[in-house]
């Protein structure tokens, strides 16, 4: 299945502790169906000190399921993503506005 959400997309969280917050996707894992959104779904990771890094409690963004994310359109509202053919190429478009993403 084609990727409806890609790295660099601005998204809003639909469910969970960060519901309603917006951020940018930093990485997507199609195999697990999850994405990491910058600054959202933060968990504290405890790391041991090593020669090149200081240990302690380090905040880290954890993956969010793609079903709990929606693309933000040009109006700033959450939208679903569709596909259509334009000039022989498959492009993504916002279902609310019809604009190409």
Swiss-Prot record:
Keywords: Ribonucleoprotein, Ribosomal protein, RNA-binding, rRNA-binding. GO terms for molecular function: rRNA binding; structural constituent of ribosome. Pfam families: KOW, ribosomal_L24. GO terms for biological process: translation. One of two assembly initiator proteins, it binds directly to the 5'-end of the 23S rRNA, where it nucleates assembly of the 50S subunit. The lineage of its organism: Bacteria, Pseudomonadati, Pseudomonadota, Alphaproteobacteria, Rhodobacterales. PROSITE patterns: RIBOSOMAL_L24. It comes from Dinoroseobacter shibae (strain DSM 16493 / NCIMB 14021 / DFL 12). This is Large ribosomal subunit protein uL24. NCBIfam families: rplX_bact (TIGR01079). The keyword rRNA-binding applies. One of its GO terms (cellular component) is ribonucleoprotein complex. SUPFAM superfamilies: Translation proteins SH3-like domain. Belongs to the universal ribosomal protein uL24 family.
